[in-house]
């Protein structure tokens, strides 16, 4: 079991498979110049599967989410999914992706054992997409969403970040589109994890702003909430249901007290929180020949020291050096 001093138990593992991405979203990465992790520093496929095996069989992990960077850029992804699906007990498996590669991989991922996907899409307007991502790939994302739905990677969830002056007027339009295509839309407040360290709280679109915008077109009814942890979105029935929309207020209404996550970076570091300054090296233990029991002990010790909260409201808060692309969302 991965328990911390506040009694929280981690059952949800986020595994970053790469820090590389084929988009350059303005709230995540610079257009040029980001230093990639060196290939020898990255965990290989066997190391990733071994760590997931330890997490599932010895530490109580029930769900594994593959992230990046962009996880579809990982050459061995389908094989990793297939091997994790063969574990006993078998964890639930999901993937967070920009969707560009889903058209060619969705069916194979489903056959390998992937359960569902979350796809990032911030706008329905190709010109705004190009401005936000610095790439002209909007059509590829839309086609990837269709492929995921057709392959049965459902429910397909769409994650959207609204940025002032770019797409902050699109919330109702995005929700109408998601309802039409039977996707579950979730709006996420922009977090201080950009590589440029340019985030400012007073410049972000808040959960309150998003809900106000949505209510100009839809009737929203709060859905009965269970604990916010691996499912942190506050969910709202749209026009009485059955469709729902989620809002993840990581900044203005954080859910740290119910957090059930542990994170593994592409270079084998355990992180207790997206915003943590500290990391614990599992790669060194792996490569020095440590047995599974020792790796599990190191992991437990790392999670035991997890802080009470992210500290975004603390005047002394310092953004972590790693950007989101190198942590894994």
Which residues does each PLM region occupy?
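A short acidic, helix-capping loop that chelates divalent metal ions and anchors anionic groups
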Residues: 33-38, 103, 125-132, 194-198, ...
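Residues that scaffold the ATP/ADP-binding catalytic core of kinase and kinase-like folds
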Residues: 24, 28, 74, 127, ...
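Radical SAM/AdoMet-radical enzyme domain recognition
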Residues: 42, 48-65, 70, 74-188
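Glycine-centered loop/turn positions within well-structured domains
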Residues: 23, 126-127, 254, 280
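Short, small-residue-rich loop/turn micro-motifs
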Residues: 19-21, 29-32, 121-123, 189, ...
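Canonical Radical SAM [4Fe-4S] cluster-binding loop centered on the CxxxCxxC motif
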Residues: 5-46
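A short, compositionally biased micro-patch
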Residues: 18-20, 112, 265
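Auxiliary Fe-S-binding modules of radical SAM enzymes
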Residues: 1-13, 176-180, 187-329
């Amino acid at each position: 079991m991965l328990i911390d001093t506040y009694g929280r138990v981690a059952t949800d593992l986020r595994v970053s498979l790469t820090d590389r991405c084929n988009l350059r979203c303005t709230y995540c990465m610079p257009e040029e110049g980001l230093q990639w992790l060196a290939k020898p520093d990255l965990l290989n496929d066997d190391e990733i599967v071994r760590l997931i095996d330890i997490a599932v069989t010895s530490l109580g992990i029930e769900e594994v989410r593959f992230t990046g960077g962009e996880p579809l850029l990982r050459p061995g992804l389908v094989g990793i999914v297939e091997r994790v699906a063969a574990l006993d007990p078998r964890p639930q498996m999901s993937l967070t992706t920009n969707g560009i590669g889903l058209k060619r991989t969705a069916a194979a991922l489903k056959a390998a054992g992937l359960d569902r996907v979350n796809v990032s899409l911030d706008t329905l307007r190709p010109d705004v997409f190009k401005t936000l991502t610095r790439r002209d790939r909007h059509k590829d994302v839309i086609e990837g969403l269709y492929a995921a739905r057709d392959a049965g990677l459902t429910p397909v969830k769409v994650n959207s970040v609204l940025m002032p002056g770019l797409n902050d007027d699109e919330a109702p339009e995005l929700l109408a589109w998601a309802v039409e295509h039977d996707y579950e839309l979730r709006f996420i407040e922009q977090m201080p994890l950009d590589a440029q360290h340019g985030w400012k709280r007073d410049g972000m679109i808040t959960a309150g702003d998003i809900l106000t915008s949505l209510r100009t077109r839809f009737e929203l009814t709060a859905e009965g909430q269970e604990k916010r942890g691996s499912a942190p979105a506050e969910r709202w029935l749209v026009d009485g249901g059955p469709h729902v929309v989620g809002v993840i207020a990581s900044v203005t209404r954080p859910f740290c007290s119910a957090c059930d996550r542990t994170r593994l970076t592409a270079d084998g570091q355990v992180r207790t929180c997206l915003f943590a300054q500290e990391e614990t090296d599992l790669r060194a233990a792996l490569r020095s020949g440590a047995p599974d029991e020792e790796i599990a002990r190191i992991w437990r010790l790392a999670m035991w020291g997890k802080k009470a909260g992210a500290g975004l409201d603390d005047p002394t808060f310092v953004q972590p050096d790693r950007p989101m692309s190198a942590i894994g969302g």
